[in-house]
Regions:
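A short aromatic-anchored loop/beta-hairpin motif
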Residues: 5-215
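N-terminal secretory signal peptides that target proteins for export/translocation
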Residues: 1-3
Length: 215
């Protein structure tokens, strides 16, 4: 296993030990093939939200909203944006002085690869070591960028830290959307960063009741 490893204990009704990778490889660059750029006739594309339907009973995804970070013919991946934990980032990285006065907590990004850490960053400008997903939202797995954001007293960027991700194989998400497990909606920075996590799913469901995204 590459990189330094830090043991993190998340309180989720029971104490769960997670090993979070501190140094991670850069995320795979987004595909630039014509097929990938076109997205899906179901409205699926990088930068969309997939919102769990009321009937989705899988405990991993019930009442969740997943922000798609990658979508192509080989599958899809994203992070759940409305499952925060009560674990402060200062507890996860006790040696990072810049975190000690901050209130941010770790978020559960999904059930896949729970050792993987993903950063979502809100910024109106390009960021080194990050990829723009949609306007004002960038994604990174760079510890260097994370340290810069934490240590800058004048930083205007917001960020969230996610452990794990949601992943689908080729055609899997399309089938789940087609049978009604998920609704597809556009994403925006306000939903990801400003809406209280407990309000994300009901708010999106109300929006979707008016008009689900259709292509």
């Amino acid at each position: 296993m590459n990189g330094r490893v830090c043991a993190v204990y998340l309180s989720l009704g029971v104490t769960v030990a997670l090993l979070l990778l501190i140094e991670l490889p850069a995320m795979r660059a987004a595909s630039t093939s014509a097929a990938d750029r076109q997205g899906s006739p179901l409205g699926l594309a990088r930068g969309r939200l997939v919102v769990a339907s009321r009937g989705l009973s899988d405990a991993n995804f019930a009442e969740t909203a997943v922000f798609l970070l990658d979508y192509h013919q080989r599958g899809a991946m994203g992070v759940i944006i409305n499952r925060p934990t009560e674990v402060p980032l200062a507890q996860v990285w006790p040696d990072m002085a810049g975190l000690q006065q901050r209130q941010e907590t770790a978020h559960i990004g999904g059930p896949v690869a729970t050792r993987r850490i993903t950063l979502l960053i809100r910024s109106s400008r390009p960021l080194e070591d990050a990829q723009q997903v949609i306007d004002n939202i960038h994604v990174s797995t760079s510890q260097t960028l994370f340290a810069r954001l934490v240590d800058r007293a004048d930083a205007v960027e917001q960020f969230r830290v996610y452990a794990g991700y949601a992943g689908w194989g080729p055609g899997q998400l399309e089938r789940e959307v087609a049978r009604g497990d998920w609704h597809v909606l556009p994403a925006d920075a306000a939903t990801v960063f400003d809406t209280a996590p407990a309000d994300v799913w009901p708010t999106l469901m109300r929006q979707g009741a008016i008009r689900w995204l259709r292509f």
